[in-house]
C-alpha cells in the first residue's frame, strides 16, 4: 500500500494554489503521483500483477486528476490521466501497432456519478432518449485480433494502446479463436477487441499444478491469464512446456467490440448501427461473445442492472470489477468522440469490494529483497470474490495497530478491486478474551539480525544484513534473472530459493549473487528445498503429513534399464536420480546471460535508483563498468538522465567491499562488463558522434527496431533519446501508431522522419537526411502579369504560394534543414488529436 495520502479526501483537498509556494507544492505532488501511478501500471500490465488494490489505484488517479483540473498548467500529454495502460517493453515479443488505438475507460463509483455521466451524454448528444448497453467488466487481459479479409493476421496485447505485443501463436493455441472468420463479406481490415481470462473455477487447480512442478503460483486469475499468455517456448523443459500449453488451453476469451471499421461502413456494408447489433455480427463470424448484456432505455434501469449484477457476481465464470455502460447508438459514438485516453460514450461503474468474515490465526513477518520486514495476516481459509484466501499483507506494524486487530480475532476481509486480499479490521463484538496482541519482532526472522529503520522517522523496519540475509539474497537473485535485468529463463522463485536457502545441502550453493555464474551441475543436483508461499515467503506445509513440503528442482528419478539396473555412467545424484532438464536449461541460460548488454548488467546489480533509463545512459556514455566505477561524482552526475541522486547511489554502492566482489567474480566467470568497441567516456558526443548534441524521440513502430533498440541506437550515436516532444527536440522518428507525439511534433514544426530515414540518421548523421531549402517565393513585382496591377501580382503570388503549401503539406516539416545542435523549434504546444470511435479497453461481458 502506498504511504501517500489517497482517496476522496486527498482529491477534495486539491484546490487551486494562491501563492508560488502553493503551486510548487502542487507541482511536486503531481510528480509524485505520476511516478507512483506509472509504477503501479507497469506492475499491473506486466507479469507481477497489481501492487495495490484497484481502490487505492483509482484514488491516486482521482487525486491527480483533481490537481490537474485545479491547475491546468500542470497537465501534460504524458500524464497518466491522458494516457492508456502500460508500456509494451518486454524483449520476448515483437511489437505490433494497432490499426486503431485501444482506449481505456473513465470510471464512476456511485449511482449518483453514473447519473451525472448519463446527463452529460444526453446533453452533449442534443437529443431526447439515449439507449444504453450494459455488460460485465471482465478482469482479464485486453486483446486485439486483426483480421484482413476474414483471416487472422495478428493477435496483440493492448500495451500502451498504440503498440502491443504479438501473442498470435499463444492465442491460436487456446483453440477458441478462429483463424478464419465464418460467413462472407468481411471487410479488408477489421480489429476485434476482447478480453482473455482464466476461469475462476479452475484457478486453485492451476496453482496446485504449478507447485507440483516447482513453478510460482499466481495471486489471482487475472495474473494467471497474463502470465499464461505472455510466455514463450524457448528454453523450457518438456514438463514446463507441457504445463505452459495446458495453461494456455485453459484460457477463455470473449469479444466485445470492433475497431478500424468506420461507423459509416459498418452501417452500409454490415447493416449494423448499434453496439448491441455488433455482438450479433461477431457471433455470426464465429467469435466467442458473451450473452450477458442488456440494453436499457434510461439510466435508472442501468442502475438497477448494476445492483443486481453486484449481488450475483460471485456466480460468474470469471472475475469482474464493475459494469461497462456504453451508448448503444454507434452514430452517437462519433458525435460524442473521445478524450486522449477514453471515449465519452462509455464509462465503467466500479463495484465496492466484496467483504467476508474469517479468523485471524496468526501474524507472521517476511523479509523482502530490500530488507523490508512486512507482517502478513494468516487466516482461516475462506472464499472471497471467487477464489480462496488464506493470507493478506498488513504492510507494517503501524498499519496493524491502526486496524486494531488481535491474533485470534474474527476479521473482515475483502479483495480490494476483487483482486488483492485486504484485512479491514476486527469484529469486536465477537471477541472471547482469548485474543492477543501482535508484537513486531526485533530480530529478522530469516537471519536473526536486529531490525531497525533505514533512517530516523521511517515506519518500516528493515534487516540491515543485506549481504547474507537469505531472504534478501533470494530476492536479489530473482531480480538478476528478471526480464528487466538479465532475463534468465529457469531462475524463478523456486530456483532462487533452492540456490540460496536449500534444505540440503547444509551450505547453500549461493551465499550471495556473486557466485551465480560459477554454478556447475555438481552444485545443482544435490539440492532439496522446501516450498515457500509466493506472497509471504513462509514455508508451506503438506496437509497430509504436517511436514514442510519438499521438492528437488534440479534432479529427477533415473529410469531403469531393461535388466533392472541403473546406468552407472551418470556422475551426479544418488543411485536413483539424474539431473533434470531444469538444471540443464538454467546452466545454458546463465552462460547466455554473460554477454547481455552492459545496461542490463547495471540493472541486475540492484543499485538503488539505477533503472533501465539511467543504466542505458551510463552504459552509452562510459562504455564499461570499470570506467563507471572510476568516475567522479561530477562526471557521473553530468550524464544526461543520471544526475546527483543516482551519482551518489553509484558511489555508495561501489564503496561496499562485497558489492565490488560481485563484479569481480562475475567478470572472472566471463560476464562481459564493457560495450564492445566503445570509444571511451562520452567519446560519441565529445568526438563528434553523428548525433552529438541532438535530441531524438522515437515513437510508434519503427521497422527493424524494437522500442529498446531504437533508444540504444540514438544513444550509441551520441544523441539524447527523449521520452517526450518539446521545443528542444530535433527529430521525431515516427512509425505506425505514433499517436500524440506525432501531433505535437507537427505543431512544433519538429522534423519528422520515418524508419528508413531514422536508420540513416543514427548511422550517418543529419547530413544523410538533410533537405534542400524551399525555393524562394518570387518578388511580387517580378511576377506581375503584363499590364496587371501590383495587387494582381500579390494575389497571384499568394495563390501560387498557397498551392505550393497545399501540395507540400504532408511533408511541410521537411522544408527545414538538418538542425544543428543548438537549433530550437518554436515554443508552441497543442493538445493531441484523438480517434473518436476506438473501442475502449472495457472487457465486456454481462449476464
From Swiss-Prot:
Start and end of every BRCT domain? 686-775
Concerning InterPro entries, the annotation shows: BRCT_dom, BRCT_dom_sf, DisA/LigA_HHH, DNA_ligase, DNA_ligase_AS, DNAligase_adenylation, DNAligase_N, NA-bd_OB-fold
One Gene Ontology term of the molecular function aspect: metal ion binding
Q: Where is the composition biased (Low complexity)?
A: 1-22, 786-807, 819-833
UniProt binding sites for Zn(2+)? 444, 447, 463, 469
Q: Which PROSITE patterns match?
A: BRCT, DNA_LIGASE_N1
* Names of the cofactor(s): Mg(2+); Mn(2+)
Write out the residues that bind NAD(+): 54-58, 104-105, 135, 158, 195, 326, 350
| Family listed | Belongs to the NAD-dependent DNA ligase family. LigA subfamily.
List, alphabetically, the HAMAP family matched.
DNA_ligase_A
Protein's UniProt name = DNA ligase
Q: Which organism is it from?
A: Clavibacter sepedonicus (Clavibacter michiganensis subsp. sepedonicus)
Name of the gene this protein is made from: ligA
Amino acid at each position: 500500500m502506498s504511504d501517500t495520502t489517497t482517496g476522496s479526501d486527498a482529491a477534495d483537498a486539491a484546490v487551486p494554489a494562491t501563492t508560488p509556494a502553493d503551486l510548487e507544492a502542487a507541482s511536486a505532488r503531481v510528480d509524485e503521483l505520476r511516478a507512483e501511478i506509472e509504477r503501479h501500471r507497469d506492475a499491473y500490465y506486466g507479469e507481477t500483477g497489481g501492487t495495490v488494490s484497484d481502490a487505492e489505484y483509482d484514488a491516486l488517479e482521482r487525486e491527480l486528476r483533481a490537481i490537474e483540473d485545479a491547475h491546468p498548467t500542470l497537465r501534460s500529454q504524458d500524464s497518466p490521466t491522458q494516457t492508456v495502460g502500460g508500456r509494451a517493453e518486454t524483449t520476448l515479443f515483437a511489437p505490433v501497432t494497432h490499426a486503431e488505438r485501444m482506449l481505456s475507460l473513465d470510471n464512476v463509483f456511485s449511482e449518483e456519478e453514473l447519473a451525472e455521466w448519463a446527463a452529460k451524454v444526453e446533453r452533449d448528444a442534443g437529443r431526447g432518449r439515449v439507449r444504453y448497453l450494459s455488460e460485465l467488466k471482465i478482469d482479464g487481459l485486453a486483446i486485439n485480433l486483426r483480421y484482413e479479409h476474414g483471416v487472422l493476421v495478428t493477435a496483440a496485447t493492448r500495451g500502451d494502446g498504440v503498440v502491443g505485443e504479438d501473442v498470435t501463436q499463444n492465442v491460436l493455441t487456446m483453440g477458441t479463436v478462429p483463424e478464419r472468420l465464418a460467413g462472407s463479406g468481411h471487410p479488408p481490415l477489421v480489429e476485434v477487441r476482447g478480453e482473455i481470462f482464466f476461469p475462476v473455477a479452475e484457478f486453485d487447480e492451476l496453482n496446485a499444478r504449478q507447485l507440483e512442478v516447482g513453478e510460482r503460483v499466481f495471486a489471482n486469475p487475472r495474473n494467471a491469464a497474463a502470465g499464461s499468455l505472455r510466455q514463450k517456448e524457448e528454453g523450457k523443459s518438456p514438463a514446463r512446456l507441457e504445463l505452459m500449453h495446458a495453461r494456455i488451453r485453459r484460457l477463455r476469451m470473449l469479444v466485445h467490440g470492433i475497431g478500424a471499421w468506420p461507423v459509416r461502413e459498418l452501417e452500409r456494408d454490415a447493416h449494423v448501427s448499434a453496439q448491441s447489433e455488433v455482438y450479433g455480427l461477431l457471433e455470426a463470424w464465429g467469435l466467442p461473445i458473451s450473452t450477458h448484456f442488456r440494453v436499457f432505455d434510461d439510466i435508472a434501469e442501468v442502475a438497477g442492472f448494476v445492483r443486481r449484477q453486484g449481488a450475483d457476481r460471485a456466480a460468474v465464470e470469471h472475475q469482474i470489477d464493475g459494469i461497462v455502460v456504453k451508448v448503444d447508438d454507434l452514430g452517437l459514438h462519433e458525435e460524442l468522440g473521445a478524450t486522449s485516453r477514453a471515449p465519452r460514450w462509455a464509462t465503467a461503474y466500479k463495484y465496492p469490494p466484496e467483504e467476508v468474515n474469517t479468523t485471524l490465526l496468526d501474524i507472521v513477518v517476511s523479509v523482502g529483497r530490500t530488507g523490508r520486514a512486512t507482517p502478513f495476516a494468516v487466516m482461516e481459509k475462506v472464499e472471497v470474490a471467487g477464489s480462496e484466501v488464506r493470507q493478506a499483507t498488513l504492510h507494517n506494524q503501524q498499519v496493524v495497530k491502526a486496524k486494531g486487530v488481535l491474533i485470534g480475532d474474527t476479521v473482515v476481509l475483502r479483495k480490494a478491486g476483487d483482486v488483492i486480499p485486504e484485512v479491514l479490521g476486527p469484529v469486536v463484538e465477537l471477541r472471547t478474551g482469548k485474543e492477543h496482541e501482535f508484537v513486531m519482532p526485533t530480530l529478522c526472522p530469516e537471519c536473526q539480525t536486529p531490525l531497525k529503520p533505514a533512517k530516523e522517522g521511517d515506519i518500516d523496519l528493515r534487516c540491515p544484513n543485506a549481504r547474507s540475509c537469505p531472504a534478501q539474497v533470494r530476492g536479489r537473485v530473482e531480480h538478476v534473472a528478471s526480464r528487466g535485468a538479465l532475463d534468465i529463463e529457469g531462475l524463478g522463485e523456486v530456483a532462487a530459493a533452492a540456490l540460496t536457502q536449500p534444505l540440503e545441502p547444509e551450505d547453500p550453493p549461493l551465499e550471495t549473487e556473486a557466485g551465480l555464474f560459477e554454478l556447475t551441475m555438481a552444485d545443482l543436483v544435490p539440492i532439496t528445498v522446501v516450498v515457500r508461499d509466493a506472497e509471504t515467503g513462509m514455508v508451506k506445509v503438506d496437509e497430509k503429513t504436517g511436514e514442510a513440503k519438499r521438492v528437488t528442482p534440479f534432479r529427477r528419478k533415473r529410469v531403469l534399464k531393461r535388466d533392472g539396473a541403473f546406468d552407472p555412467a551418470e556422475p551426479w545424484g544418488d543411485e536413483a536420480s539424474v539431473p533434470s532438464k531444469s538444471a540443464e536449461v538454467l546452466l545454458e541460460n546463465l552462460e547466455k546471460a554473460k554477454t547481455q548488454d552492459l545496461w542490463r548488467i547495471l540493472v541486475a546489480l540492484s543499485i538503488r535508483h539505477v533503472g533501465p533509463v539511467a543504466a542505458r545512459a551510463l552504459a552509452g556514455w562510459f562504455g564499461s563498468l570499470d570506467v563507471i566505477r572510476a568516475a567522479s561524482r561530477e562526471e557521473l552526475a553530468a550524464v544526461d538522465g543520471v544526475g546527483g541522486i543516482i551519482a551518489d547511489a553509484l558511489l555508495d554502492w561501489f564503496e561496499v567491499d562485497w558489492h565490488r566482489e560481485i563484479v569481480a567474480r562475475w567478470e572472472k566467470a566471463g560476464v562481459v562488463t564493457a560495450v564492445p568497441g566503445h570509444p571511451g567516456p562520452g567519446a560519441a558526443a565529445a568526438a563528434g558522434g553523428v548525433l552529438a548534441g541532438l535530441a531524438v524521440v522515437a515513437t510508434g513502430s519503427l521497422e527493424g527496431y524494437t522500442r529498446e533498440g531504437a533508444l540504444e541506437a540514438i544513444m550509441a550515436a551520441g544523441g539524447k533519446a527523449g521520452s517526450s516532444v518539446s521545443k528542444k527536440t530535433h527529430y521525431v522518428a515516427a512509425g505506425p501508431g505514433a499517436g500524440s507525439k506525432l501531433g505535437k511534433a507537427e505543431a512544433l514544426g519538429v522534423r519528422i522522419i520515418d524508419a528508413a530515414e531514422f536508420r540513416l540518421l543514427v548511422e550517418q548523421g543529419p547530413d544523410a537526411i538533410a533537405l534542400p531549402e524551399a525555393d524562394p517565393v518570387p518578388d511580387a513585382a517580378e511576377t506581375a502579369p503584363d499590364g496587371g496591377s501590383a495587387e494582381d501580382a500579390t494575389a497571384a503570388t499568394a495563390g501560387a504560394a498557397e498551392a505550393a503549401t497545399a501540395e507540400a503539406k504532408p511533408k511541410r516539416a521537411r522544408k527545414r534543414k538538418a538542425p544543428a545542435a543548438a537549433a530550437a523549434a518554436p515554443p508552441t504546444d497543442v493538445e493531441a488529436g484523438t480517434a473518436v470511435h476506438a473501442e475502449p479497453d472495457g472487457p465486456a461481458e454481462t449476464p
